[in-house]
Amino acid sequence: MKQFKVVPTIQEFETCKDFADTYGIGKGDLVFVSNGTKNHLFPELDNSGAIVVNYRNYGSGEPTDLIVEGICKDLEGKTYNRVFSIGGGTILDVAKLFALKTVSPVVKLFNKELEIVKDKELILVPTTCGTGSEVTNISILELTAINSKFGLAVDELYPDKAILIPELLAGLPMKYFATSSIDALIHSIESFTSPKGNDFTRMFSLNAMDMILKGYQEIAKNGEEARKPILRQFMLASTYAGIAFGNAGCAAVHAMSYPLGAKYHVPHGEANYAIFTEVYKTYMKLQPVGIINKLNNHLAGILGCGEDEVYTEIEKLLNHIIPKKALHEYGMTQEDIADFTETVMTKQTRLMNNNYTELTAETVTEIYKSLF
């Protein structure tokens, strides 16, 4: 059986003020937002009566179980009915957990050893153009005990509202624009080739690919500032890709990037890009006939090349956005290859089940070696 659903109501606002006026955030609300975003765009939060959490007070980089436990401790005894999160994917993923009745112990929650009950309204507002988290039922944390990222995917994590405000992308530095939008591109591609994909998910995948790659071509031709007039295009593409992978899932690219990102603190989109094309070249060697042919045909049309050249040409285009690095440039060692492979094969089965074709441990090892 194939299925497709979009749970959150998606709303778009012209400005942050329009959003704030509509929702009237105040007493009884929990708001996750960085100091920079709050001070610049939502200064009224300081005197609103809402509980305001600056995620960065609890740690830097990608979210961990320890960060969530720290926030839980500080929220003990405080009550709230609505959870707002205004930020990138890390902040959105953390905030989702606080719409649940019980969050701690976090490791038990992620292992599904706790009863999972949602008892608060959840409103997510992305400030980047990559996560897609605003429309998915997935929260990703680094679990420090296994030194890798791990996902919890349950319907209780679906937001009630996904709020799109293109104004929020205006101040996003090129570096963060690059890593987040590449993540969205890979969401669209992995969901397209997933066995769980269907005509509905692939419609969203293809639209996201078109919008992102054509935007990249504009940037490659005219420079970084060319992104400014098309920021709404990238925000929509990110949400389209989120709808696609929220239904069809991501796969080996994400699974293989997680240990790299967790151990060496590589930004999520950049870690995905480091792995991406080699996985798809491997798919083509193992199973050259299938849905991947439709993907290659579509990409060839956008890139203006032959189907046998798409992964070379897409890499050339992406290198205008963020240069690709070898894995050792992030600090990865030869010894990590075996450890990362074991983590992928034993801890990331949720993702590996969505591969276009089966990848064995030996194949995963070879991909890491070729990228080292």
What are these regions (language model features)?
Residues V103-D199, G290-K294:
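A glycine/threonine-rich phosphate-anchoring loop and its flanking beta-alpha core
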Residues G89:
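Acidic-aromatic/histidine active-site loop/patch
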Residues D29-V31, N81-F84, E121-I123, D160-A162, ...:
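Structural motif
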Residues L41-P43, V94-K96, E134-V135, P173:
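Short glycine-/acidic-enriched loop or helix-start segments at secondary-structure transitions
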Residues E156, H298-F372:
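C-terminal charged capping/lid subdomain of soluble metabolic enzymes
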Residues S191-K316:
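Active-site segments that bind and position negatively charged phosphate/pyrophosphate groups
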Residues M1-R82, L327:
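ATP/NTP phosphate-donor binding region
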Residues D93-S104:
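DPxDG-like acidic metal-binding loop motif
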